Structures are given as structure tokens and as C-alpha cells.
């Protein structure tokens, strides 16, 4: 592909790579070449990430561990900057776009030192530490949710969080028809969460028999928790599909009337774009309390209830489920509120900001394939 090159910088986890993938697709439709610089974890996505080339640079997380471990992380970041400097001099990208996490620091810092245009995307409702370090050094900042930061206001644009193609497709699915079944999706993140395995089955087992007989549960469960979770659902005569990973999770979300989940940026953004009611349990003890900030955005719309993990008990959840599952019109109303807050075209908004920052006029946009 000829034309300008955009270099994306993202850590090798789904929370960083999903929005980077969505932007890569949006840029490709505009005739823009995309390459990815990341860490070794992202190599497993090499066959699916829409970039013409992938590059790795050393990176580390200097915020935890012993003094020796933190020192080693800083050294790795330093080596990463040197490697990124060589890479950017060779590639000469029109702009470098970072998606957070410490693996994005070397490429963005190197681009800033070389005077290359830079864009930083913050997915969460509060800026993470790596992004805070980079914020004053970049030319433009895109935010998934509104950020309350007067110092950054001049360079800040709320684009929303770019959605992966499967989530965009799910956003077009209709709300589940009322057929007597009660559809519940339970997910705890890319690897599942033990708290969901500990709390949700016990809460469901305590529901009245009439509700249990109508429930259809899809639950993401860690392999080591699978047997005990299945045993509880079987004992309660509840239909449940369990897996450690669902490749079609956005579609499963669209099929549900209620979702119980953590509050990562991708989860909250997909809940809003698809439009589903939710009970959110933010990950506790996070340094930046990013999930609590994300959950607050959806709570403010009236689409979600937010529960602290310490209050997330079988007794509490069983009571909330009994009330919510007995009032399907309320769940539908909450879904509509979520949908109204969704930003389905976030990838297009971010693509336009990226190209404006680069000073590039894009070619005609090809239709999205979802």
C-alpha cells in the first residue's frame, strides 16, 4: 500500500490492541499504510492484526517490584527508546499514535524527540501513569471518555473508544425478543475473574425456582473454576454455557438482556455501543482506579449499576437479580440509555484526528467490512 505511514504503538494486551486494531482498519480504508510497534506479547496477534509489519521494542513497568526490578525496567525502557529512535528514523512515519501502557512509551518518546507528530489515546475515564508521563510531550490527545484535566484541554478531543469489527457488528443486532427466557452474560475480562465464579453461581442458585427455570447463562470462567461452577448450575437446574474464552463475546453481549462484568474501557464502550443493561464490579485496588471511573460514566446514564467488590456478595446479587429479571421493561429501558451513550464511530473520529495531526489529506473512505 502506497501513501503515508501511520505507526501505532500499543502494549500486547487486548485493552490496548483492540482500539489500535480498530484504528488500523479505519486508516486502511482511507488508503493509509499502518505498522505496529509493540512488545513480545502481541506477536500472538501477528496473523490477525491489520498492519503490514510489526516491530517489537523492549519495555518495562517501573512502578512495582524491588529496587533491582524497577531499575531493570527503567533500563529496558531506555533500550526501547534507543531502538525506537532507529526505527522511526528508518520508517519516517507521518504520525505516531500511542494507546497506553509502558510499551507505548519508547515509540512516543522517540517520536517526540525527533519532532514527529504524535497522538495519544487514553481509553479510560482517568489517565494512566504511562499516558500521564507522555501527555505533555504529544501533539494531540484522544479520550475514550471525558477527562477532567484543565491542563490538557487545549489538545484534548473526546473521540470515544474505537470498537473492534465484531463489536461494531454486534452493535447492529436487535434487542433480544421476549420469548420467556432470561439471558444473562457474565464476564470478568480476557481471562475471566475468580470473583465472578465465587459469587454469581451461588447468587443464581438462591433465586426462586421460577426464575432459575427461565435463565440462560453464558459465563466466562477460568479453567480451574469450570468444574465447581458447572456443578452449582447443574444442581440448581440452570442452563449455562461456560468457557474460558468466547471469540464472539460482543455477539453474546448482544444476545443478553443483562450483563455482569468488570469495567474495563473496552467492556464499558462495547456495552454502550451495543446497548445493554449491566451490573459492573470495578477491579478494586487499582492504582489509578480506572475501572471505577469507567463504570461511573455508564452509571451516570442510568444504564448500569456499580457495585464495589466488597459489597458483591451472593446475597446482595441474588436480590438484585430477582428484582431486575422480574422487570424486563426496566432492563430494556436501561439498554436504550446505554445505546444513547454509545460512540459507534469512534474509530472514524480517531482516524480523522490522526490524519489532521499528521497534516495528511486522506483518500476516499472505503466502506467498512464488519
What are these regions (language model features)?
Residues 66-95, 113:
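An amphipathic, basic-hydrophobic alpha-helix
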Residues 330-344:
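A short, well-ordered alpha-helix in the C-terminal region of glycosyltransferases
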Residues 4-75:
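Glycosyltransferase specificity loop/lid
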Residues 323, 343-370:
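C-terminal alpha-helical cap of glycosyltransferases
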Residues 33, 41, 112-172:
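Active-site-proximal region of nucleotide-activated glycan assembly enzymes
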Residues 24-29, 35-37, 41-51, 57, ...:
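Donor-nucleotide binding loops and adjacent catalytic segments primarily
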Residues 93-95, 254-269, 276-277:
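Acidic donor-binding loop of glycosyltransferase active sites
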Residues 41-45, 95-114:
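An aromatic- and histidine-rich active-site surface loop
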Amino acid at each position: 500500500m502506497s501513501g503515508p505511514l501511520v505507526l501505532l504503538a500499543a502494549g500486547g494486551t487486548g485493552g490496548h490492541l483492540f482500539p489500535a486494531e480498530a484504528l488500523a482498519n479505519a486508516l486502511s480504508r482511507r488508503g493509509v499504510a499502518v505498522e505496529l510497534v509493540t512488545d513480545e506479547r502481541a506477536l500472538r496477534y501477528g496473523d490477525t492484526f491489520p498492519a503490514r509489519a510489526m516491530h517489537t521494542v523492549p519495555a518495562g513497568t517501573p512502578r512495582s517490584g524491588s529496587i533491582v526490578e524497577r531499575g531493570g525496567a527503567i533500563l529496558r525502557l531506555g533500550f526501547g527508546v534507543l531502538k525506537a529512535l532507529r526505527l522511526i528514523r528508518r520508517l519516517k512515519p507521518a504520525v505516531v499514535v500511542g494507546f497506553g501502557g509502558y510499551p507505548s512509551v519508547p515509540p512516543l518518546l522517540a517520536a517526540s524527540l525527533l519532532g514527529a507528530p504524535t497522538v495519544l489515546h487514553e481509553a479510560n475515564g482517568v489517565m494512566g501513569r504511562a499516558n500521564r508521563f507522555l501527555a505533555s510531550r504529544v501533539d494531540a490527545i484522544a479520550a475514550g471518555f471525558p477527562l477532567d484535566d484543565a491542563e490538557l484541554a487545549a489538545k484534548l478531543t473526546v473521540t470515544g473508544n474505537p470498537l473492534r469489527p465484531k463489536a461494531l457488528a454486534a452493535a447492529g443486532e436487535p434487542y433480544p425478543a421476549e420469548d420467556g427466557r432470561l439471558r444473562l452474560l457474565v464476564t470478568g475480562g480476557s481471562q475471566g475473574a475468580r470473583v465472578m465464579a465465587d459469587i454469581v453461581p451461588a447468587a443464581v442458585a438462591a433465586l426462586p425456582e421460577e426464575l432459575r427455570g427461565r435463565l440462560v447463562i453464558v459465563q466466562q470462567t477460568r479453567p480451574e473454576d469450570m468444574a465447581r461452577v458447572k456443578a452449582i448450575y447443574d444442581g440448581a437446574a440452570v442452563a449455562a454455557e461456560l468457557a474460558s474464552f468466547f471469540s464472539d463475546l460482543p455477539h453474546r453481549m448482544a444476545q443478553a438482556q443483562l450483563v455482569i462484568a468488570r469495567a474495563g474501557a473496552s467492556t464499558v464502550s462495547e456495552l454502550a455501543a451495543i446497548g445493554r443493561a449491566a451490573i459492573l464490579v470495578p477491579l478494586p485496588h487499582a492504582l489509578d482506579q480506572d475501572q471505577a471511573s469507567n463504570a461511573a460514566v455508564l452509571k451516570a446514564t442510568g444504564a448500569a449499576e456499580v457495585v464495589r467488590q466488597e459489597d458483591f456478595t451472593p446475597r446482595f446479587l441474588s436480590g438484585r437479580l430477582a428484582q431486575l429479571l422480574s422487570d424486563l421493561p426496566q432492563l430494556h429501558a436501561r439498554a436504550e440509555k446505554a445505546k444513547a451513550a454509545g460512540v459507534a464511530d469512534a474509530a472514524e473520529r480517531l482516524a480523522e484526528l490522526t490524519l489532521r495531526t499528521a497534516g495528511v489529506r486522506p483518500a476516499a473512505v472505503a466502506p467498512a467490512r464488519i
